Curated annotation (Swiss-Prot):
PROSITE patterns referenced in this protein's UniProt entry, alphabetically: SPASE_II (PS00855)
Reaction(s) the record says it catalyses: Release of signal peptides from bacterial membrane prolipoproteins. Hydrolyzes -Xaa-Yaa-Zaa-|-(S,diacylglyceryl)Cys-, in which Xaa is hydrophobic (preferably Leu), and Yaa (Ala or Ser) and Zaa (Gly or Ala) have small, neutral side chains
Protein origin, superkingdom: Bacteria
Gene: lspA
Protein name listed in UniProt: Lipoprotein signal peptidase
InterPro entries found in the cross-reference section: Peptidase_A8
Family according to the record: Belongs to the peptidase A8 family.
Broad EC category: hydrolase
Length: 163
């Protein structure tokens, strides 16, 4: 029996999303098992591995009073994830399939951080870029995935949706 093309596209996106989530979760598990909280290991001159817990959102916004707010963030995240998944499912035609690639990056990162936030109460961050004493916000692979997806969305909308 031949599988319809729409299911092949959905399967490709599913495996893409699953692999990014697995990479994110495995990297965070490695950090937990190999570093102490706030321990820093230099990798290269401008990058450290630095284990921190982010009780807030991006760039540690809303990080004070993590208790109740965590449930609200989990609820908001789950609603956003469902909306993106529904949008992706509706865009499985060949014309719209490449629109789903940025969505796949974003949904992967959202799910990776959602898992941390809902099961641990915080997100594990560990990538620390710096120049001398100036440090960018510490982040993780899920955050990188969200960033890549956002850049791809901007690129797609700027160069492919001119009509």
């Amino acid at each position: 029996m031949k599988i319809p093309l729409i299911y092949n596209r959905i399967l490709i996106l599913f495996f893409f999303i699953a692999n990014i989530i697995i990479l994110d979760q495995v990297s965070k598990k490695w950090i937990i098992n190999n570093l102490l909280l706030h321990e820093k290991k230099p990798l290269i001159s401008i990058m450290n591995i630095f284990y921190v817990r982010n009780y807030g959102t991006a760039f540690n916004f809303f990080s004070n009073n993590p208790g109740e707010k965590n449930y609200i963030l989990c609820l908001i995240s789950s609603i956003a994830i469902l909306i993106i998944l529904k949008t992706m499912y509706n865009n499985t035609t060949i014309e719209n399939f490449f629109y789903n690639i940025p969505s796949a990056f974003i949904i992967s990162g959202a799910i990776g951080n959602f898992i941390d936030r809902c099961y641990l109460g915080y997100v594990i961050d560990f990538i620390d870029f710096h120049i001398n004493n100036w440090h960018f916000a510490t982040f993780n692979i899920a955050d990188v995935s969200i960033f890549i997806g956002s850049v791809l969305f901007i690129y797609h909308n700027k160069y492919f949706l001119k009509n």
